[in-house]
Amino acid sequence: MASSDFNPDAPLHIRALNHTTIPVKDRYKAALFYVAVLGGEMHHESAPDRVKKGLARSLQVGVRLCAGLEIDLFEQNYGQPAWDQSHPHHALDVPTEELEKWAAHLKKWKVPFVGPMTRAGTGSAEMYFNDPDGNHLELHCSNYPGHEKLPAGPYDKRLTVHKQPWPPLELEAEANRLLQASLERMRRLKKSA
């Protein structure tokens, strides 16, 4: 990171966001979504006996979405945002040339979404959707060509609510296959380390 990336007057510096946590009702069911739909890779999982012994606070799995971004999916029965809230949400930066492909990909996986749309004057394009636990997500493209032709927000949040259980029955086997392959790679790496 270049020194110009930091506030020169700050006595200490933060290099990057290491990870973020998201509350979910079932860590492996949530991981299905983050691996199958968002292309994440399983990074770690907590052992239930560590929670029982008080060595870990809750059951969780970690999914790495890209270099430098890990999402820890913590099991808890509260904390998911209401469907009609905009915040908090997690914005994921995607390549401009892939935004339309993301729309097709979300449709394939039966994920309700809104967009692409823009926020007036930003030059960006966004798509909004929820994970199956109701956590709000955004796919974001800065400097999107043709942004001025896109509808401007705010969007109708009702359009991002999952009306059916996810994954849909016809996609469940594929989602499970992707998750199992990712879990096997993670466990192999842990054994070889």
State the predicted function of each range.
Residues 22-70:
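Core segments of cupin and vicinal oxygen chelate
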Residues 51-55, 80, 118-122:
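A short beta-turn/loop motif at secondary-structure boundaries
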Residues 71-74, 138:
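Conserved beta-strand in the GNAT
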